[in-house]
Every structure is written in C-alpha cells, then in structure tokens.
C-alpha cells in the first residue's frame, strides 16, 4: 500500500486480520450535507431541488389577496457574502451569516375581466428583490458561529410520521384486557387515533381530545350505514327454505368454528355433531357430499346482524345493522307467499376471528347523517362555540384534507403505504407530493380495517423503538421548519396588505416585512434546545458532539416521560447507533452517538453498509440498508471465515436474522458486515481492547476521552486502534493540503505550497497559502494552537497533513500521554482509585495544559453620565496601575495575579446634587475624583496568568483611544505585510513558471531582444518580472500562456488591493455594539496549569481517579535498570470493574516501548540500514496482523521512520479485530522482556525488593477537564443574600461553606455551645453582631457579642403575614 507523507513518518503496526472493505466515511457529513441541502447556495436558482429553503418558499408562495385581484409570486432566492469571516465574527461577538435576498413578483389582476386565466386579465407585473434577513452559514467543520460562540445543532431522533398500531399491554383496564389502538401521525397537523375500549367498541380521538365513536368519523367522510357495513364485513346470504332457513356453504368460513347444530347431508348422514369443531376433514366430507347450502335452525340466526334494510311493499320491516331476534323471524314468516321474502343477507361474524366491532359501534352511535357527525366533531374540537354545519365542515376539512394545515410528508406517506401494504413510488414532483401529503377517505378506512384485523388476531402491532419507526431530523430540516414558521407569519401580514396593493401603488418591498422570518431563524439558532454550545475540549469532543443524536428537544421526548424501553439498546441499533456511548445519569439512552459507518437516507432513516452475498459468495458490492430494508435479510458477521475466492467456508455461519443471532447454511446468507467496528461509535472505536472491557466501564471510557484536556506537547498513543488518524483528519483541527505540491516556504504561522503542474488551473501562479491558528481560546477555555509538521522542500499530496492542531501528533489524535505505570498498592496513596504520581511527570511537563480565559470590560452610558476607560482611577496606588498603559488597558505580556487591575474604568456617582457654584469650581479646577467610583476590570479570584491579547471595540461615532489605534495600526501593518509577502510568493512562482515556459524557446522580440534569440534559464536569472513578461515568443501557445500569467498577476494585484481596502474599512469603521455600550475591551489571559493533587485523571477503559500525592522521583519504585515508575495504580481497581483491557494495554504498551528502545539502541550504535530494515520487518510482518510493505520506503524514509519510533512503536489493535494474547507475548519476547509482562521492582525509599513481581507497562493516561484549580475555593468575608442576610454559596458567588442541619447536630451532640452560637449568629446572619465582631477583632479584644439572627426576623415577618401577631419580650 502507498503511505501518505505523514503516515510513512510513523507507521502504526496493525493487528487487523480482516481486509479493509471500505474506508470510514467523512465523519461530519450528517451536519455538512444536511445544511448544504437546505441552503443549496452553490446551485443555480433554476437547478435547485425542492428541499430546504426552496421548498419552504414554494410551499408558502404564491400568496393571493382575499379579493383575488393581486398575487405575490416567488421567483428565486440568492445568498450574499458574509460581512465578516469566521475569525472576525468570533472576536466581535457577531453571527457568521449571509444576507438573503428573494426575487418576488407582484401580479395585479383586472377585477372586471371575466376570464381569470387569460393574459388580458393581468394588469400589472412588478418584480423586485426583497431582503429577507440574515441566514447563518455553516463553517467548513459543521458548526455555526452565533453571537461570537461556536454552536452545534444536534440531530434529533423522533418518531417518524406514518401510521402506528400498538396496544396498552393490558394496563388501561382493570380486567387486564389488551386494548389495541392505531395512530396516524402527520409531519405537521392533527393526530388521529383509533382505539378499542373494554366493551370492544371502536373510538376515535383527534389531537388526544375527548373520544368520539369511530363511526362518527366514518359518517363525517360521507359514508352511510350500509356503505360502512359493506366496507368492513363479508355477507352471508340467508334463504327461506321449505321448513328451515338455509345458508351458503363456504368452506373457509367454517374452518375452526364450533358447530352450533348438527350438520346433516341431504342423505341424512350427520357429518358434524353439535359442539364439535369443524376441521378440514369434515369440510372435505361436506364437499364430497355435494352440498352447497346448509339448513340452519332459527336459533342460529338470533343475535346475528342484518347487512341491509328489509323492505316489503315499500315499507321498511328492519333496518341494516339490526340484531335478528325471534320476533323478527316470526314477522318474516308471517308474510303471504306472494310478498314473502325469499332471501336476505346477514353480516359474517364470529367469536374467533371476525368480531362485529364496527357494527356494534354503529349501533351505539346516535348520529345518523353526515351533518350531525360533523357537528359532533366540532363540539369536541371547539367546546363552547355554537356549531353550524358550514363551520363544522370547514374545520373537519382543514384538519385532515387541507395541504396548508396537514402534511403527512413524503416520509409519512411512504411509511403509511408500506404499513398498509399499498404501493409507494418515490417522486420529486412537488405537486404529486403535495397531493399525497393529505389523508383520503380510503386512508382512514384502511387504517380502521388494519386495526380490526389486528384485533381479530391477524397482524402484528408495531415496535415504536424500531429504527424503522424513528427517523433523524438534521440541521437542515429543523432550520427549514423554523423558516417556514416565520414565512407563515409573513404570509398572514402580507394577505392583509395585498388587497390595497394596487390602490396604494405598493411594491413587493413595501408588502413584505421580513422581521418574523429573521426572528424565527435567530430564535432557532440562538435558543433552541438542540442548538448547543459546542463541546470544544479536544478534537474528539467536537466530532462526537456533531455526530450526536438526541431524542429530546421540541417534538421529541422529555426526560421524565421516557421509559425504560426507549432508552434500551434495540437490535436495529446494530451499525446505526452506538450501544456503548451515551451519558450516565438522567439522559442515559436518550442521547446517543452515530455508529462509525452510519448515515441517513433521503427519508431520514439511519442506514448501515453491508457487503452483498450471492449464493454463499461475498461480493464487493456495498449496500446501505435502513432498518426497514433490513427486515428479512440474513447478515453474517464481518469475521466469518471466507475462502480466497470469496465463498463463506463454514458449514453453518453465525448470522443475524430478524434481530436474533442464529446459525444458518451459507446459501441462505444475503449480506455480511463490512467491518467489526461498524457497531460502535467513533469514541468507543478509540478504545483498544474494547472487547475485553465491561460495557459500563467502556461507556465511561468513551465519555471521559471527550473530557481530556489537550496537553502542552501532544503524545500519540503507543497502543491505539487505527481510528486516531480518521478523527484527527475529519475534526478540522489540522491543516490539510487541498492540492499536492512542494513546500515552498514555512514558518510558525503559515505554510506556502507550490502546487503540482497537473493540479493547477490555467493561468494561475499555482500557490496555496495556509495560515495557522495560534494560541486562541476554545469554548471550554482550552488552547487551540497549530504546529507545522512539514519542512521546506517536502513533496506532499492532496489530503496530507501540514500542521497538527490541539491534541494531534503527526496527524493522529493524541488526547493524553504514554506513562510508565505499575499495578501495586503503595502506602495507601492509591486507596479508592487514587493515583500516585512521580514528580518526574510534573518536571517533564507531561500533563501541563494551557488555558485561556477571556475577560470583558464594558463601558456603558449610565443615567448619570458615561463610564470611562482610563488609567486615572481614584484612591488606587501607583503599584496597582503599573501594568496599565496611558489608556488604562493592560500591556500584552504582563504577568497578573488575582485582584490586579486589567482595565481601569470609572463610573459616575450620583449621590450629591451640586450647586451651580460648585459645578463652576469643578469645571475650572477639574476636581473629578470625588464624583466617580472605581469599577475596573480585575483578575478574578483564584486566577493568575499572562496577558496574551487585548481587543478594543469602539462604538461607531465615538473617538478611538490610543490603544485602539495602536492595535488597529499593528493589525493593518501585519495584514499589509502578509499581502505583500503573498504577492511576492506569487510573483516568484510566476517567474519560475515563465522561466520553464521560455527555456529553449525562440523569441520574435520584446524586452530589447533580437528576433530569433533562443532563451536559456541562465540568461533569465537576472531579468525582472516586467522584462520577462515583455518577451514575445515565436510559439503562439507559449505566448498565450504568458499572457494568461500576466493577466493573472494583474488580477492578483487588484485582488490584494481590494482585500486590503476591505480590511482597512472593517478595522477603521466603528463597531456595531449593543445599545448604550460605548466601548468593549476584551483581555485574554493564558494560564499554564501543571498537574497537582486533586486533578482528575483517567485511562481509556473507564479507569478514573484523582491524583492523591506527587512523590519525589527517588521515592518511587524502580526496576533492575533503575527506571522509575511514573504512576502507581491500585490493582484492586481491575477485578471488580471487569475492564481487563487496561491490563492488556499495559503489556502491549511495554512491548511497544521496549521495541522502541531497541531501535534507539541500533540508531545510537549506527547499525547498518539493512539490519534496521530486518528488525522493522520482524516487528511489522512477523507477529501477525496487516503486512507493511517496507520495500516501498527509501533508505531516507526508513531512517526517518526509525527516528520517530525511538520513543516506542505505535500499535493499532482495532475494536473486535485486535491483538491476541499470544501476539502480545511474542512482541514482549521480541523486545527482550519476560513473556508474563511482569518485573521485579525495588522500593525507592529503602532500596528493598518488593515481595512479588509487579505488572509494569505503558498506559495512555488522560488529564480530564475537572481541575482542582477550578474547584478549590475559600472565603473570608463576601457577599450576603438580600433577605436572609446569610452568606451566599458556591464558588461563582464567592460563597461560604454551608453549616447544615447535620453539622449542627454534631455540635449539639458534643455540647459545644459557644461554637454553636457563633455558627448560628456572627458567622451567619446576625448583621449587628458581625460588625461588632469585626470591630472587636480589629481592637484585639477576644469576646463575642451576638445579636438577633436576621433569619429569625424573617420568620417573625412570615408569621405576621399569616395574620398571627408575634412579639419578642426582652427578659433583661
């Protein structure tokens, strides 16, 4: 295989034995693709599909006025370019969005013209482009910048629209009878439910309101009683015989029934005795006897139901749906032969599988006409309003049959038709989709029929947790819904104004007010439950956050209501949703993560890839199947043994079929998994030896990796899974080459690439410049910094990594550090998961992290005057102002401590009203200090650091201070320098290209050259660029290419001038600040945090703990070679937790390190390159796993590789396809260590040998974002609660420790009266006592004088508020 530039620098040894069938897809596609479909900004307006914005506009427009004489039509929309780029938006606290304009056509029709459709009827057409507000844009990494913060819109997993059949599991009724129900859920609109009650009547509910008989809905659809009976029942003809009634013999209807009378053949033989079950043999006997009719006794007809009206001589004897009784039969027999009834029909019902539910419901129904039914529905939906037939009809029609109010959506229609066994053809035609989006009479009847089938015992209820019944709603779809809501509001307002459009000569711009649209969009992105502040701890947490799938949110579940079933792992989750990664706590199971290979289809259902298997042979065809399509397939595991030609080799293969694991012959297999890791999510896929960890611990492991803080120097994991590279690449934190080429120039802040000839666009200079992000703050206050990993002259290809971001090392995710650990108890310092750490780790800065804090100072307009940012602060000593400049703002580079002033600010005080004389004196002598108070921005308590950046934003129209001007100048200078440098690089590249083009060419003149001169590179070295461009070569093609280059350079110069002018305009213009804000100063503090006792650390297997002590190196255990251990972990943390993966990781890590040391030894002793190759071949190709083609690497590559392997050979043990125990032992042996992976250790304090051998190795440890610095807190005096006057609580309020009820009991138990009194009075809420106490302490007196606690006053006031007078009597 070919290795990329970064991969060959450090090849990870893979233990995978299964072939790679498909690459891991782009991890952020669920976000990026969804929003791209919503905006369709790169498509021409005419080529846009009917989705996203296009669909929203099309569904609302055209808008017609009430009178019908004016109409607004939508033509097209287009997005402008955003005012600020992403970086500027974050700095300024603004939204990264593009202005959206819509071309709208206003058509005014002629009222008097009779013919509505003809062209003559149109009086006037006005077309105009209307501004519709700003539309937030997605950054390249799938995030949005809203008000200066990066946010992610989490996808929602909600119940798919369609029809669902369910039952109450026997919980609704005391008898425990199972009651079935059906529910039609539209995408938007009213829900329609049908349900049985305990008496087997069918009821309907609309929007979960009061229930109605289902027959009322059927009548409202315009069906009569007999039509309803025809739809739901088969009929049985009853004939009047000589002596008895007879019925037709229909074999299928009799099978399984109990005979209610003797069935006798014409010959008089009894075939079926009364009370015996009719089986197939007896039916055969009846058919053989040639019987077509059976005689029945009258009793058989009792309680049967008439299927039609019985009419004699125009008189209705009995209505349809009447129960037959003795009287009716007597009546029928009584008629004269001439007018008697020869035959009639009854409904075919029985107690086994043909219930008379609808007939019973009809009988219970008091309504008899459509009008009555509509009014009944109206009464339920609009109680208290007087119903009329017109309003009732309008309401019922708008609820289910009007496309503006009811939308089943394409997905809903697909699910609806599939569930009811009707055909569904997907189409892009908007009109057909709109037509199909409403219900029809047939739909409602079909749902009822299916419900009755299920009640009759034929058919299954649905499983609502099946992923075929839950779909994903991504960013684009949710944004579209919000946008449509805004447009509907606009539509209402426009309809009002449209009528007067002609008379007032209005244009589309006057008619449309885009505020509701802008507000709806802003509200969605700014404050929706699913628009979340991005978790930016490290690259993994970013990727995971974008791949998260939540069942919560608007239109979803709530934590309280969600039961156990919704949260549980379902068999359809396989390959779609990760069974491991989910939060602990109340959200468990409601928030999930997408599996590695999962993606959504056009309907929003999750799909997972499988290889197609035909006749027991595995093909290379990959099919994505949704949970719906997976039903009925037989899927083999990814590790099923396969022969060389792709045939499944086992006689019986372990497969999944209908959610069960079974064994089947290869011929029956239809599909096969593509990879063993397709079950898990990205975070779980980063855990090596995951298959050896208990699921609960794996869950913690995958969650804690997201909390790892990027360390100062990233260190790739020695034991990884091979997933690291994918996460780092797709997270967007690295700089990735867009085109291949050679590194032209490189420094700490940018990379310049000279692009390969074949990847260039004609006429361009072929230069790509990549600027790096340096020391910026992330959402979680960690540090984002990119570091170059390429050198000048390196050849790179598309997709190569040029610079590492935070937590990446040579293009691989590196969340923590490889640390030498030992599993042993050590003096109780690792009791209860504590971690004992060596001072060496602190000295080497292994777990040192940089945190950047943003502090903001705002100068506002107050009622008493304007706040001022200044260095002239009253009553503050010189020392406190030492690090401020003349504008009152701290210098960059200043080291500041808690309480130091960062920005000096004074606010006017308004206590005293000045007399005119005083005002005059003030004005003359400028004595200002008296009327202002100090409100400077200070470093918060428990913080200190270095100022690394200052930003000043000034309101438009307010004069900028010296500091703001200086910042502006330095930014412009640096930008100008960058642009000049950019131009220089382009010109250099152009020179190079011109030289190559002209080399060996004849010229016809120009630049003072004689015609016929042959150019040589050496001659052109000293020529200027202008001279070169003047040369006129003989060959026309060359001449054309020179002209192209010249034009390109002119364009580039123009482009650079425009860029500079634009930047200058942005910088010099005032900032758009909130109302009343004059100036904002942002100060960025960088803090270096070393690891210390109290910090939380963890491995990748859920093995977490808190640092208990940092020991001197000399006291730590050491081995025979004098190597000390860095961390001592408690061995008791392994057995009960069942995460054995950490032990295997430790052993494999030790082997990796040992091999690295061997390579280091070879390099130091300058071993021959052949020996190096042989040793590397042993490591990579002799101990199992994927083979590495070392022959394809040059000697220089081998040396570079060996140099990078000195610290250890990185291993990749993929999930479910990783290293086996024997392989780990072989590698330990190859590294020259004991196969058991244990060593003899000595006590650092005494030098004595420990009794037993100890497991020592290398584990990848993470430092989590739960730092003791952020949690430690102490208070002397501080703020008090307003009412109770008790100290506030919590670090944020600078609060105290609560001395609670139980602590009081403890003091009471020991009779510590004075301590108790002190706690309840002066240390808490006794205001006077506090003051006296303070005075006493200052005076050096040692006594306490407690008063009345304020909470006692509060209590007396509360009792008084109940109307009970309470007075305190003073005893002395």
Curated annotation (Swiss-Prot):
Its EC number is 2.7.7.6. InterPro entries: DNA-dir_RNA_pol_bsu_ext_1_sf, DNA-dir_RNA_pol_bsu_external_1, DNA-dir_RNA_pol_su2, DNA-dir_RNAP_su2_dom, DNA-dir_RNAP_su2_hyb_sf, RNA_pol_bsu_bac, RNA_pol_bsu_CS, RNA_pol_bsu_protrusion. GO terms for cellular component: DNA-directed RNA polymerase complex. CDD domains: RNA_pol_B_RPB2. Disulfide bonds: none annotated. Keywords: DNA-directed RNA polymerase, Nucleotidyltransferase, Transcription, Transferase. This is DNA-directed RNA polymerase subunit beta. One of its GO terms (biological process) is DNA-templated transcription. GO terms for molecular function: DNA binding; DNA-directed RNA polymerase activity; ribonucleoside binding. HAMAP family: RNApol_bact_RpoB. It catalyses: RNA(n) + a ribonucleoside 5'-triphosphate = RNA(n+1) + diphosphate. Pfam families: RNA_pol_Rpb2_1 (PF04563), RNA_pol_Rpb2_2 (PF04561), RNA_pol_Rpb2_3 (PF04565), RNA_pol_Rpb2_45 (PF10385), RNA_pol_Rpb2_6 (PF00562), RNA_pol_Rpb2_7 (PF04560). DNA-dependent RNA polymerase catalyzes the transcription of DNA into RNA using the four ribonucleoside triphosphates as substrates. It comes from the Bacteria.
């Amino acid at each position: 295989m070919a290795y990329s530039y970064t991969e060959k620098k450090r090849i990870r040894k893979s233990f995978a034995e299964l072939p790679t069938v498909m690459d891991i897809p782009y991890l952020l596609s669920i976000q990026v693709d969804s929003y791209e479909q919503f905006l369709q900004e790169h498509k021409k307006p005419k080529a846009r599909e009917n989705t996203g914005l296009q669909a929203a506009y099309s569904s609302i427009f055209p808008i017609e006025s009430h009178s019908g004489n004016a109409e607004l039509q939508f033509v097209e929309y287009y997005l402008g370019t955003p005012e600020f780029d992403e970086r500027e938006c974050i700095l300024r606290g603004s939204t990264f969005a593009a202005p959206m304009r819509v071309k709208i056509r206003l058509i005014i029709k002629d009222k008097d013209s009779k013919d509505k459709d003809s062209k003559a009827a149109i009086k006037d057409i006005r077309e105009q482009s209307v501004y519709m507000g700003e539309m937030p844009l997605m950054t390249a990494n799938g995030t949005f910048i809203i008000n200066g913060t990066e946010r992610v819109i989490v996808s929602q997993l909600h119940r798919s629209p369609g029809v669902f059949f369910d039952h109450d599991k026997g919980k609704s009724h005391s008898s425990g009878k199972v009651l079935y129900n059906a529910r039609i859920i539209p995408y938007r609109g009213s829900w329609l439910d049908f349900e049985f009650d305990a008496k087997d009547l069918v009821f309907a509910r609309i929007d979960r309101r009061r229930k109605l008989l289902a027959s009322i809905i059927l009548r409202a659809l315009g069906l009569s009683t007999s039509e309803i009976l025809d739809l739901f029942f088969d009929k049985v003809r009853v004939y009047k015989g000589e002596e008895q009634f007879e019925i037709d013999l229909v074999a299928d209807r009799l099978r399984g029934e109990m005979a209610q009378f003797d069935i006798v053949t014409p010959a008089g033989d009894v075939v079926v005795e009364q009370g015996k079950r009719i089986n197939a043999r007896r039916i055969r006997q009846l058919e053989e006897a040639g019987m077509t009719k059976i005689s029945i006794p009258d009793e058989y007809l009792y309680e049967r139901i008439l299927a039609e009206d019985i009419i004699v001589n125009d008189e209705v004897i009995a209505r349809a749906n009447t129960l037959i009784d003795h009287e009716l039969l007597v009546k029928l027999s009584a008629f004269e032969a001439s007018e008697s009834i020869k035959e009639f029909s009854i409904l075919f019902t029985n107690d086994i599988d043909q219930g008379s539910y609808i007939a019973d419901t009809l009988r219970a129904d008091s309504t008899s006409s459509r009008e009555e039914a509509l009014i009944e529905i109206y009464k339920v939906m609009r109680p208290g309003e007087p119903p009329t037939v017109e309003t009732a009809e309008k309401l019922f029609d708008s609820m289910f049959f009007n496309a503006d109010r009811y939308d089943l959506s394409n997905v809903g229609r697909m699910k609806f038709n599939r569930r009811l066994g009707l055909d569904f053809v997907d189409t892009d035609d908007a009109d057909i989709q709109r037509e199909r989006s409403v219900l029809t009479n047939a739909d409602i009847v079909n749902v009822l029929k299916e419900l009755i089938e299920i009640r009759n015992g034929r058919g299954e209820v649905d499983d609502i947790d099946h992923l075929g019944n839950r779909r994903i709603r991504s960013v684009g779809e949710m944004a579209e819904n919000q946008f449509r809501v805004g447009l509907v509001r606009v539509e209402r307002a426009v309809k009002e104004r449209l009528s007067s459009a002609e008379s007032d000569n209005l244009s589309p711009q006057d008619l449309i007010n885009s505020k509701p649209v802008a507000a709806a969009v802003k509200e969605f992105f700014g404050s929706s439950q699913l628009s979340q502040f991005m978790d930016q701890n490290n690259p993994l947490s970013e990727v995971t956050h974008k791949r998260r799938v939540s069942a919560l949110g608007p239109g979803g579940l709530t934590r309280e209501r969600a039961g156990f079933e919704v949260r549980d792992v379902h068999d359809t989750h396989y390959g779609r949703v990760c069974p491991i990664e989910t939060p602990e706590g109340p959200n468990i199971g409601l928030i999930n993560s997408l599996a590695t290979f999962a993606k959504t289809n056009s309907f929003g259902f999750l799909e997972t890839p499988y290889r197609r298997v035909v006749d027991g042979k595995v093909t290379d065809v990959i099919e994505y199947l949704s949970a719906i399509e997976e039903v009925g397939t037989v899927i083999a595991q990814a590790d099923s043994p396969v022969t060389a030609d792709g045939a499944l080799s086992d006689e019986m293969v372990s497969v999944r079929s209908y959610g069960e694991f079974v064994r089947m012959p290869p011929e029956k297999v239809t599909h096969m998994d593509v990879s063993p890791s397709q079950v898990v999510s990205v975070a779980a896929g980063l855990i090596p030896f995951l298959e050896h960890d208990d699921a609960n611990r794996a869950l913690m492991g995958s969650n804690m990796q997201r909390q790892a803080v990027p360390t100062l120097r990233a260190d790739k994991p020695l034991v990884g899974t091979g997933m690291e590279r994918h996460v780092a690449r797709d997270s967007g934190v690295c700089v990735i080459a867009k085109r291949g080429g050679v590194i032209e120039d490189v420094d700490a802040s940018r990379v310049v690439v000279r692009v390969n000839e074949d990847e260039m666009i004609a006429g361009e200079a072929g230069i790509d410049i990549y600027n790096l992000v340096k020391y910026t703050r992330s959402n979680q206050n960690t540090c984002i910094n990119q570091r170059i990993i390429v050198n000048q002259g390196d050849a790179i290809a598309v997709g190569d990594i040029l610079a590492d971001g935070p937590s990446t090392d040579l293009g691989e995710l590196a969340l923590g550090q490889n640390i030498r650990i030992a599993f042993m108890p050590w003096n109780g310092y690792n009791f209860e998961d504590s971690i004992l750490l060596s001072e060496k780790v602190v000295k080497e800065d292994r777990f040192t992290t940089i945190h950047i804090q943003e502090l903001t100072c705002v100068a506002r307009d107050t009622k008493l005057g304007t706040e001022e940012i200044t260095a002239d602060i009253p009553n503050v000593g010189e020392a406190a102002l030492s690090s401020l400049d003349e504008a009152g703002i701290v210098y960059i580079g200043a080291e500041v401590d808690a309480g130091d002033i960062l920005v000096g600010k004074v606010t006017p005080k308004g206590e005293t009203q000045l007399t005119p004389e005083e005002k005059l004196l003030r004005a003359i002598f400028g004595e200002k200090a008296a009327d202002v108070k100090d409100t400077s921005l200070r470093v918060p308590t428990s913080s200190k650091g270095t100022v690394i950046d200052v930003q000043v934003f000034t309101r438009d129209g307010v004069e900028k201070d010296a500091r703001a001007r200086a910042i502006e100048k330095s930014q412009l200078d640096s930008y100008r320098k960058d642009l000049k440098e950019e131009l220089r690089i382009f010109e250099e590249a152009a020179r190079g290209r011109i030289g190559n083009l002209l080399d060996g060419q004849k010229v016809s003149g120009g630049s003072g050259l004689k015609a016929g001169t042959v150019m040589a590179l050496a001659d052109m070295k000293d020529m200027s660029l202008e001279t070169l461009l003047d040369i006129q070569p003989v060959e026309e093609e060359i001449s054309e290419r020179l002209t192209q280059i010249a034009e390109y350079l002119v364009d580039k110069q123009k482009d650079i001038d425009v860029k500079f002018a634009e930047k200058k305009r942005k910088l010099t213009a005032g900032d758009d600040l909130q109302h009343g804000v004059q100036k904002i100063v942002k100060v960025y503090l960088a803090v270096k945090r070393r690891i210390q006792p109290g910090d939380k650390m963890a491995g990748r297997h859920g093995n977490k703990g808190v640092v208990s002590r940092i020991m001197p190196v000399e006291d730590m255990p050491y081995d025979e070679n004098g190597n000390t251990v860095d961390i001592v972990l408690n061995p008791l943390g392994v057995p009960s937790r069942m995460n054995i993966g950490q032990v295997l990781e430790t052993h494999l890590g030790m082997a990796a390190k040992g091999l690295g040391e061997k390579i280091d030894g070879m390099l130091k002793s300058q071993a021959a390159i052949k020996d190096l190759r042989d040793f590397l071949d042993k490591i990579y190709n002799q101990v199992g796993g994927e083979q590495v083609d070392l022959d394809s690497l040059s000697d220089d590559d081998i040396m570079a590789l060996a140099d990078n392997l000195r610290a250890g050979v990185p291993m990749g043990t993929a999930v479910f396809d990783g290293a086996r125990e024997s392989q780990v032992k072989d590698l330990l042996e190859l590294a020259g260590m004991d196969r058991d992976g244990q060593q003899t250790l000595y006590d650092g304090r005494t030098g004595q040998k420990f009794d037993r051998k100890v497991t020592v190795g290398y584990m990848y440890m993470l430092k989590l974002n739960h730092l003791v610095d952020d949690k430690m807190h102490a208070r002397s005096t501080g703020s008090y609660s307003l009412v109770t006057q008790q100290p506030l609580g919590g670090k944020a309020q600078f609060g105290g420790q609560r001395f609670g009820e139980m602590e009081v009991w403890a003091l009471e138990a020991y009779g510590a009266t004075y301590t108790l009194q002190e706690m309840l009075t002066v240390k808490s809420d006794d205001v006077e006592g506090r003051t006296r106490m303070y005075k006493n302490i200052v005076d050096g007196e040692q006594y306490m004088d407690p008063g009345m606690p304020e909470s006692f006053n509060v209590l007396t006031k509360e009792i008084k508020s109940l109307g009970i007078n309470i007075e305190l009597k003073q005893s002395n």
